[in-house]
Amino acid sequence: MSSGLARGRILDVGEVGIDMRTLPPCDEGRIDPRSWFKDETCPLEIEIGSGKGTFLLQQSELQPNTNFLGFEWAAEFYRYGADRLRRNGRKSVKMAYGDATEFLQYWCEDQVAEVIHLYFSDPWPK
């Protein structure tokens, strides 16, 4: 729970949010992120640099039979975006807090995503 971007409102990432710090060590085997969704058979699309979740919110409405996984490494934006998706009842969307490059390189099974979206990712950590 957090406030900040929400101007005093408590943010709750609920089941939408995934904190990569809670994942098992990457040497314990690869993860298939499709297993995080209710319908694992739907295609998976990944967005890197999800910010406040605007693309995920809009695209999940346009593509209800697609699972979306967004990555954001700025904690405040992650919490705001995941809370926003949760409040809007998006069941086919998850938002991960952490480095997408690290996840895709070390944790994620190969060839699980149909599409990777890169719109406003920040390539330079501050």
What are these regions (language model features)?
Residues 105-115:
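A short acidic, Gly/Pro-enriched loop at the edge of an enzyme's catalytic core
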Residues 113-126:
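A short SAM/SAH-binding and catalytic strip from SAM-dependent methyltransferases
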Residues 43-105:
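SAM cofactor-binding core of SAM-dependent methyltransferases
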Residues 1-46, 54-61:
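S-adenosyl-L-methionine
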